Amino acid sequence: MNQGTVLVTGGAKRIGKAISLKLSSDGFSIAIHYNKSSKDAFELVEIIRSNGGVADAFEADLNNSEEVSKLIPKIHSTMGNISGIVNNASLFSFDDLLSISDDSWNEHMNINAKSPILLIRDLYNLNDGKNQASVVNILDQKIVNPNPDYLSYTASKFTLLGLTDTLARSLAPKLRINAVAPGHTIASPEQSDSGFSKSQSETPLGTGPSPEDIADSVSYLMQAKSVTGQIIFVDSGERFLSRKRDVVFETES
């Protein structure tokens, strides 16, 4: 049974791809957002369609508010009723207190926090109140276990955390707003394979989360009709580890 269309931002690769595939298997039509990953996006569209699902791909630069504002109307006109959004797309570039710049701060905030606000607003305005819609924001375990590295990124995730609670209160009953906070799931560009393995093995559970683990939690929240304003940590307990620096740097020594 088709459960309506879900927009997955950054839905073509990595964790976003796992989320898109899982929600498709749940019966949702998938609107795969991409910016520069057009090849990956349309390949995933074909994979979903070959498995009997419904999918299409939509381009937008989430650092550009004008492009963001066109995304929900375009998906609605192409794919019909939108029953949810997964705000998965995220910029993760290094800065700290000494290296932070206006460009870094603004780009992180635009992509990681402002674009989710605009998409949620457009979904709320589109929703006629007859069918409750669901939003899942992808956060980070850093929201309870911060360190000085990736300062703009971390601040943007704290902003999205606050929005999750605020909007869950104010947009009910038309929209449910929840979040998933992953741990270190995929190796960073600066990280070696051995460093990534070390970072996952050092968690309290002795292994790290997989993209599919994240997708399973998103799937639950997308369909849990009585749940709003909640955060699920999918981090193998990483948030209990106190680190002076980001895990990428601590596991490379």
Please place each PLM-identified region on the residue numbering.
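C-terminal substrate-recognition "lid" of short-chain dehydrogenase/reductases
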Residues: 211-234, 239-240
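Conserved glycine-rich Rossmann-like NAD(P)H-binding loop of the short-chain dehydrogenase/reductase
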Residues: 28-43
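Conserved glycine-rich cofactor-binding loop
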Residues: 12-14
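Substrate-binding pocket helix/loop in short-chain dehydrogenase/reductase
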Residues: 96-97, 101-106, 199
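Conserved Rossmann-fold SDR core element
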Residues: 23, 161, 171-185, 227-234
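Catalytic loop of short-chain dehydrogenase/reductase
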Residues: 132-159, 164-172, 184-185
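Conserved NAD(P)H cofactor-binding loop of Rossmann-fold oxidoreductase domains
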Residues: 88-93, 237
